[in-house]
Amino acid sequence: MKRQAAFIDSKKLLKGALHCHTTRSDGLGTPEEVLKKHVVHGYDFVALTDHRYYNFANYGDAPLTIIPGMEMDGSLPGAGWPYVHCHHIVSVGPEKAQGNGFEQDQRFDSY
């Protein structure tokens, strides 16, 4: 079997992060600090996906594409302190202008 390159040379490859946390949940940097680090390291896009907080704030001055998003987790009450996470779901987009109904910094405790 002949080996072939996985990517076509004529296409532009983008460097990005689709799962990223800030101090709005358990991350170590503010949204602005996280975006700045990604810019410094040459990223083209980043999705801010804090736990149970939907991020769609306008960071229009950032020189990379910001994708709004959120991470939800399912939990089992009474299975440990204070609960056991059994799965995580990362969602990205759509933008607020498209009518998703979420408020910035609104916490979601169920889905």
Task: Show the residue positions of the predicted features.
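A metal-dependent hydrolase metal-coordination microenvironment
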Residues: 3-111
